[in-house]
């Protein structure tokens, strides 16, 4: 993906969610909720503070994050793939291996 995030923006590719229940039933429609985990594809330079300094972001390319999938998260097709553009504050946690 050839894209660069600006300022405190993060671009995330949503991870696929399991479409079968523990009992092997295939989930469809509203039962198959969208995943709120994804891989960070690009990050901006950081948040610009009131004093003009730039605070680097806590996430880096390749991190797996849990994110808030609500207002302010923009879905965009980039190179025929869905990518989510969000503020770094929409990321709730980094999943560590």
Curated annotation (Swiss-Prot):
Its main location: cytoplasm. SUPFAM superfamilies: GroES-like (SSF50129). Pfam families: Cpn10. CDD domains: cpn10. The keyword Acetylation does not apply. GO terms for cellular component: cytoplasm. Keywords: Chaperone, Cytoplasm. InterPro entries: Chaperonin_GroES, Chaperonin_GroES_sf, GroES-like_sf. SMART domains: Cpn10. Heptamer of 7 subunits arranged in a ring. Interacts with the chaperonin GroEL. Together with the chaperonin GroEL, plays an essential role in assisting protein folding. The GroEL-GroES system forms a nano-cage that allows encapsulation of the non-native substrate proteins and provides a physical environment optimized to promote and accelerate protein folding. GroES binds to the apical surface of the GroEL ring, thereby capping the opening of the GroEL channel. NCBIfam families: PRK00364.1-1 (NF001526). This is Co-chaperonin GroES. It comes from Stenotrophomonas maltophilia (Pseudomonas maltophilia). The gene is groES.
